[in-house]
């Protein structure tokens, strides 16, 4: 696919698989803007990055067989493999559009870790867990997540997604404080 916004150049092609997508050439601009992780001579994009960059018209996703994929097809593809993917995507898109750099946060007990600036120069500031309004959370769950985030010098943020179709997100932040 050609893109008028980049001088008519072809968009980087992204081969989609269960874990995200792989871009094998013309990905330098994406990498410079902190999208993906470079492995050898390919850029690995996680599922959220894959959908976001497709929605923004910055990559051209395709199946392993070379068939093009739309944003809706990508959302359905990843949702089948990861329940709650759409709610996570709504939060990913919101944070990215607010200027944050958003990466996986599973290592820290959340869906995302969020950087306010250059992730090569600073540590992430927040660990974000995504929930829907009917999600039951015990006080123990919240305290455990807050304490874990504190132990790695981050604030714990709960992102409550009210509606994935007409996105409404409520962010609640906790900090661990010794008295």
UniProtKB/Swiss-Prot annotation:
Family: Belongs to the tRNA-intron endonuclease family. Archaeal short subfamily.
Coiled coil residues, start to end: none
Domain of life: Archaea
CDD domains named in the record: tRNA-intron_lyase_C
Key words of the record: Lyase, tRNA processing
Function, as annotated: Endonuclease that removes tRNA introns. Cleaves pre-tRNA at the 5'- and 3'-splice sites to release the intron. The products are an intron and two tRNA half-molecules bearing 2',3' cyclic phosphate and 5'-OH termini. Recognizes a pseudosymmetric substrate in which 2 bulged loops of 3 bases are separated by a stem of 4 bp.
EC number: 4.6.1.16
Source organism per UniProt: Methanopyrus kandleri (strain AV19 / DSM 6324 / JCM 9639 / NBRC 100938)
PANTHER family recorded: TRNA-SPLICING ENDONUCLEASE SUBUNIT SEN34, TRNA-SPLICING ENDONUCLEASE SUBUNIT SEN34-RELATED
Record's protein name: tRNA-splicing endonuclease
Molecular function, one GO term: lyase activity
Pfam families xrefs: tRNA_int_endo (PF01974), tRNA_int_endo_N (PF02778)
């Amino acid at each position: 696919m050609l893109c008028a916004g980049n001088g008519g150049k072809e968009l980087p092609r992204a081969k989609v698989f269960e874990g995200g997508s792989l871009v094998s050439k013309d990905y330098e601009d994406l990498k410079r803007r902190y999208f993906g992780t470079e492995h050898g001579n390919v850029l690995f994009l996680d599922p959220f990055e894959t959908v976001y960059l497709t929605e923004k018209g910055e990559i051209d996703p395709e199946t392993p067989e070379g068939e093009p994929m739309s944003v809706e097809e990508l959302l359905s593809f990843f949702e089948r493999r990861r329940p709650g993917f759409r709610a996570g995507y709504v939060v990913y898109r919101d944070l990215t559009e607010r200027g944050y750099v958003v990466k996986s946060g599973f290592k820290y007990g959340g869906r995302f870790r969020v950087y306010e600036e250059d992730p090569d120069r600073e540590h992430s500031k927040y660990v974000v867990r995504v929930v829907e309004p009917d999600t039951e959370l015990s006080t123990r769950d919240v305290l455990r997540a807050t304490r874990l985030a504190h132990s790695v010098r981050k604030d714990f943020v709960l992102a409550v997604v009210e509606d994935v179709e007409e996105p409404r997100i409520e962010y609640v932040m906790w900090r661990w404080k010794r008295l």
